[in-house]
């Protein structure tokens, strides 16, 4: 059973009823895990097979970044690759577009992290690479890494069109991959879009859950104080 979870933002209690009451669950988290350690994932993994992509909040702090990218959990990040999970080929594109790197439809400032580092002063280099913030920025090379593959499902943190803040370049990636469904996080609403695209698009919002068909099993409203 494949489940898609949107934007946990550090809270995971809402997931337990779904992974404990169903057998053989693969849980795919669509970014913004916002952890301070891998402990939450370690506990949740007793009940399900966890996969994820990173979101913009996953490089807000060193601890958030290290929890998923500096531990054994980094092997479960689907960013930049296509992995077969329960018979479904799932392509992952984590992170967000940022103007300092690439804000489609504008031309990119840098093609890949190496290009960025070549033209950056030494004080901007972090641990031999791009700054912490840009560890969750999308480069053109991220899309190039998977666009010639084939997949059944594309998961991404950013939204495609027709979301008002979506990006056509994600639709183009979905078309190249030949997917039948795109699941995205980032935006905290729950939307199943009505489009003329040859694939479905589902926005899995704040602490919400859908099944593989995009049916909402849990819808949560973000009522946190701003």
Feature map (PLM): residue ranges:
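Active-site neighborhood of phospho(di)ester-bond hydrolases with catalytic His/Asp-centered motifs
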Residues: 4-7, 27-32, 51-57, 77-79, ...
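Short amphipathic alpha-helix with an adjacent loop that forms part of the alpha/beta core around
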Residues: 15-22, 84, 142-148, 218-220
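Binuclear metal-dependent phosphoesterase catalytic core
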Residues: 14, 83-86, 172-176, 181-226
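A basic- and aromatic-enriched beta-loop-alpha substructure that forms the phosphate/nucleotide-
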Residues: 49-109
């Amino acid at each position: 059973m494949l489940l898609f979870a949107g934007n946990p933002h550090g809270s995971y209690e809402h997931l337990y009823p779904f992974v404990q009451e169903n057998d053989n669950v693969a849980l795919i988290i669509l970014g913004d895990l916002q952890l301070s350690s891998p402990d939450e994932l370690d506990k949740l993994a007793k009940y399900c097979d966890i996969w994820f992509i990173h979101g913009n909040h996953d490089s807000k702090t060193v601890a958030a970044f290290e929890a998923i990218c500096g531990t054994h959990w980094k092997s479960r990040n689907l960013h930049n690759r296509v992995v077969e999970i329960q018979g479904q080929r799932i392509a992952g594109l984590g992170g967000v577009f940022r103007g300092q790197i690439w804000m489609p439809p504008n031309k990119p400032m840098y093609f890949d992290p190496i290009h960025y580092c070549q033209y950056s002063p030494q004080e901007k280099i972090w641990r031999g690479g791009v700054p912490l913030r840009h560890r969750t920025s999308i480069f053109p090379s991220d899309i190039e890494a998977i666009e010639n593959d084939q997949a059944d499902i594309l998961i991404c943190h950013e939204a495609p069109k027709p979301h008002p803040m979506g990006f056509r370049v994600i639709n183009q990636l979905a078309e190249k991959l030949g997917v039948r469904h795109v699941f995205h996080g980032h935006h905290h609403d729950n939307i199943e879009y009505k489009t003329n695209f040859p694939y479905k698009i589902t926005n899995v919002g704040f602490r919400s859950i859908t099944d593989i068909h995009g049916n909402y099993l849990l819808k949560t409203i973000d009522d946190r104080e701003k």
